[in-house]
Structure formats: structure tokens, C-alpha cells
């Protein structure tokens, strides 16, 4: 089995631009990338390509796809919106519109999945109304999954941890609430084929403080619905997005769980590449790629 190593390049895109970030990813040895669609992508901004219509979006992202292909880089997934619905009508409507364009850009890039965040306690408080949270979740995903279907991609909902502003578990960091929200959409025939899960190991690791499963057991319990990853490590308290094996996560158990569910996707990392400073991001990313390759080599011998 050819196991691909990927890395999220949002920070590189912000510092160096989209095209240069792809070149850097290739140079440091990545097989694949998680491509950010968040940087200056808002249809309400005249400076954004999203404000110029789908022809302009297609032209721009087609060139990026050509660049990635020429470098031998797989754009496996994109990162879309990170706020979820806030129960603020104007902002929620804008979120849907921008997600529609994210789905279109994802397809143009040749990626299979666009990762998004659900509604969060970060914006709605430490003890939000459960009915409201599930309504916001259902309303968001039921409105955006048709765009995924139209573009032949999938929307991935990302696992959560704590709500850092409040020293509380994020509402959908509670595993049972996450599953309930996921199933509410997944059980609908017209949505099920275009909805999936991204496990963020660091987020799930922070949720264990609130009696939630370990990241490995999150993977086991979600099973084959896990199709994309944000692999990162932390101390279980802070959302550090550290390189695997530099925090407290049991990585042998993570790989055991991935094997048990038959995971065959990209081993994609989402890291704080600025941990050692913005001037050291490339070196940090390169080391992370080497670490993941060595982990895979030691485990699988390939």
C-alpha cells in the first residue's frame, strides 16, 4: 500500500502565496496537501477572487491545479469555513455563500473533500442551548451539502475539543453530541454520499478532559466514516497543533485504530508551522514530513 504523507499549507499560503506554497510542499517532500480556502476568500470583499464570479474562480484554481500536477502534489482536501453558524442571520447567510464557492473551488482543484467546522461554543457560549446547537448544525449542513453534491465532492465535519475561551468542552467536542449531529445529516439519503468526517487528533485529545474518548477511540467509534485527517499532537490542554510524537497522544494506538477501520487515505498533518517562528515554517514543515515518514516506515516497513 502506498501511504501518502500530507500537510496543511494554510500558513505557507498566507506567507508565500498559493503557488509558492505548493512549490514549498513539493520541495520538502510532501505527497499531498490540505489546501486552505480561507485566505482572502470572501465574496463580500472586492479584493477576493470569490467576488468576481465562478469563471474567475475556475480560472484561478485551474492554474493552481496545473501547478500541483506539474509538481506531483495531490491536493487531497481543502479547508473551508471554520466558524459554523452563529445564529446571526447575515453572517450565516454569508457563510453558506462562501461555502458554496469553497465547494466549487475544491472541485476545480481536484480535491475530494472540503473540511469545515460546525457551530461552536467559542461563539455561542459555554452552555449553549442543545436544541439550538443541533438546529444550527442541521441547517448549515443541509444547506451546503447540495453544493458538495453538485460538485461531486464531500463535506467533512471536523472533530472538536474544548472551547478555549471558557475552559469548557465545546458543545460538539462532546462525542455523543458530535455523533448525533453527524447522524442527523448522514441518515438522509440525499445527503449521505457527500458527508464524511475529518478527525482532528489534537482537538479530540483536548476533549478527553471532559470524559470523552481518546483520539484513537474516537477513530474506532466513528469507523469507516473517517476519510480525512488532521493529525497533530498536544498536551491535552492547549490547541498546540504540534508535530506527532511531541505531545501526549498515543500514536501507536492512533495507527492501530486507523488500521482497524481500514483507513486508506492520506496521513495529513495540520500543524502550527509558526511554533518556532514565521521564519522557520519551512524547516518545521520539512521536519514534520520526515517524522511522519519515519513513523510509517517503522510501523509498516514501507
Where are these regions (language model features)?
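Histidine-acidic metal/acid-base catalytic patches
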Residues: 1-6, 11-31, 69, 96, ...
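N-terminal small/glycine-rich loop or linker at the start of catalytic domains
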Residues: 1-9, 76-86, 120-125
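Active-site-proximal loop/turn and secondary-structure-junction residues that shape catalytic pockets
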Residues: 11-13, 37-39, 81-84, 120-122, ...
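Aromatic/hydrophobic pocket-lining residues that form π-stacking "cages" and hydrophobic walls in ligand
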Residues: 21, 64, 102, 144, ...
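Short beta-strand segments at enzyme active-site cores
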Residues: 33-35, 75-80, 112-119, 153-159, ...
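Glycine-rich, proline-tolerant flexible connector loops at the mouths of alpha/beta enzymes
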Residues: 34-63
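Short glycine-enriched, charge-decorated loop/helix-capping segments at active-site entrances
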Residues: 47-54, 91-92, 130-131, 241-246
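Active-site acidic/histidine proton-transfer and metal-coordination neighborhood
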Residues: 69-70, 85-199, 206
